[in-house]
Every structure is written in structure tokens, then in C-alpha cells.
């Protein structure tokens, strides 16, 4: 697998521990020359206690700091939104890889598919497609990685790196890569570290 350019047309919402930190994020971004995409404030259309602020990075990606009552505690990303040229094709792709990747699919609305894993979720919505993205999901076994690759390539999705160990990343790193319908690289990886054994 080769190096990729930076992602485009992506939305990432980062966890902020307080409303004050949301405000600090936005003010620092504006002072740093980032474009405003939504000043700090409540957004009750999302959730009653949702408070967020939005900036655009130099590539046009939407970057948000968000604080609300049901924030994830095990990571820095609250949510991710991908855009796709063909929502039905993306739904089929994630449906194919879901069993081996430990994911399940929820249709939240006709134009909104949510992919849910054990430690978070992301949304897929129609629009000019996200590009240049590499997204990896954890696997508990090398066999799950093999099955992920076999299922995806067997369904006609393009190989982006066959199952195998990649010691350049770290000892025990076992991953496989396929391309989603929009050409983004999706990986399943078993880190084979003591916690995984």
C-alpha cells in the first residue's frame, strides 16, 4: 500500500471536555487563519445538550469540537461523516465487510447510513465523495482479517493490500486493505499485542 494524499470532503467531530474548550478551539482556529464554518453555540437539532463549533481546514474538511452529555470517553473522536457518490453502493460495501469487521449497519434515514462498531460509529451520506481517506478497524484475530479481505474481494471490491504481517508498522501488525466504492482505503488490522492474545 502506498502513501496517500490528505483526505478531502470529510467531517470529523473531536471530543471537547467542556463548552469552554469548544470556544477555545474555535477562537484558536480563527486566530490561526482557519475559515469559520459555525461559531460556538448550542445545536439542539443534533441533541438537546449539543454544543459545537466548526472550522474548515485548508483542504476544505469540516473540523468540529463538540461537547454533549453522551460523549465517548475512550478516544478523541466523537464522530466522523463520509460523503459518497452512491449511497446504495457504499451501504452494500459496508454490509459485505461488516461481519468480519465487527460492524453493523443502521439506516437512520433514506439518505443517512450509520456504521456502528464496538467503540464508535461513523455516518455515510450522499454528496461529493470523500477522497484520500484511510480508515482502519480493529480485529481480534488474523483469521478475521483474512475473512474481511476474502469477503470484500470476493464481492468484487478492489484489493489495496493483501492480508499479511507488516513489521514496518510494528511487530505482529497483521492487516489487509480494500478500496471502498469511492476509492478510499479501508483496513482491518490485528495488532497482535498482549491485550489481543
Whereabouts are the PLM-identified features?
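Long, continuous compositionally biased terminal/linker segments
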Residues: 1-3, 8-10, 113-155
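Intrinsic disorder/low-complexity detector
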Residues: 5, 73-75, 197
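Residues that flank catalytic or metal-binding motifs in active/ligand-binding sites
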Residues: 8-10, 51, 76, 131, ...
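Vicinal oxygen chelate
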Residues: 12-58, 85-88, 136-182
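A short acidic/small-residue loop/turn micro-motif
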Residues: 44, 68-71, 167-168, 191-195
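Short, contiguous alpha-helical
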Residues: 56-63, 179-195
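Surface-exposed beta-loop interaction hotspot
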Residues: 57, 66-85
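Core segments of cupin and vicinal oxygen chelate
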Residues: 81-121
Amino acid at each position: 500500500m502506498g502513501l496517500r494524499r490528505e483526505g478531502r470532503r470529510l467531517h470529523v467531530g473531536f471530543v471537547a471536555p467542556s463548552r469552554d474548550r469548544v470556544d477555545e478551539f474555535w477562537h484558536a482556529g480563527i486566530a490561526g487563519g482557519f475559515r469559520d464554518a459555525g461559531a460556538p453555540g448550542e445545536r439542539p437539532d443534533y441533541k438537546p445538550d449539543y454544543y459545537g463549533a466548526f472550522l474548515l481546514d485548508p483542504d476544505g474538511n469540516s473540523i468540529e469540537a463538540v461537547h454533549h452529555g453522551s460523549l465517548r470517553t475512550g478516544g478523541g473522536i466523537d464522530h466522523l461523516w463520509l460523503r459518497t457518490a452512491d449511497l446504495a453502493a457504499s451501504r452494500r460495501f459496508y454490509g459485505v465487510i461488516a461481519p468480519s469487521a465487527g460492524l453493523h449497519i443502521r439506516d437512520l434515514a433514506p439518505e443517512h447510513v450509520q456504521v456502528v462498531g464496538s467503540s464508535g460509529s461513523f455516518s455515510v451520506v450522499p454528496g461529493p465523495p470523500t477522497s484520500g481517506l484511510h480508515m482502519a478497524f480493529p480485529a481480534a484475530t488474523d483469521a478475521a482479517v483474512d475473512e474481511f479481505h476474502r469477503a470484500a474481494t470476493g464481492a468484487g471490491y478492489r484489493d489495496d493490500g493483501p492480508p499479511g504481517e507488516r513489521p514496518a508498522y510494528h511487530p505482529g501488525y497483521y492487516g489487509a486493505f480494500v478500496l471502498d466504492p469511492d476509492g478510499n482505503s479501508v483496513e482491518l488490522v490485528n495488532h497482535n499485542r498482549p491485550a489481543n492474545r
